[in-house]
Amino acid sequence: MNHYVYILECKDGSWYTGYTTDVDRRIKKHASGKGAKYTRGRGPFRLVATWAFPSKEEAMRWEYEVKHLSRRKKEQLVSLKGGPYENTTKLSTT
């Protein structure tokens, strides 16, 4: 089973970073108001990036690192092409 870290852009322009084993299911939870407290009332969302990891520990470590980055650093990270984060994906979601 893969473990994912993702970044959502909320309708107010803020970014939310989270962890899940099923990105689609988790975004639906956020959209229904049953996701993280932070995202309630901030939809619709746009999925900005996802990273896949083989273990929960690795994913949780990465989530912690990303959550502690400034917005500018997150934007730089998401815009990277190649390198260790080449599996970053950009998708639109409502």
From Swiss-Prot:
Family: Belongs to the UPF0213 family.
Gene3D superfamilies: GIY-YIG endonuclease
Pfam families with a match to the protein in the record: GIY-YIG (PF01541)
Sequence ranges assigned to domain GIY-YIG in this UniProt record: 1-76
Disulphide-bridged cysteine pairs: none
SUPFAM superfamilies: GIY-YIG endonuclease
Top-rank taxon, per record: Bacteria
Protein's recorded name: UPF0213 protein BH0048
Coiled-coil ranges from the UniProt annotation: none
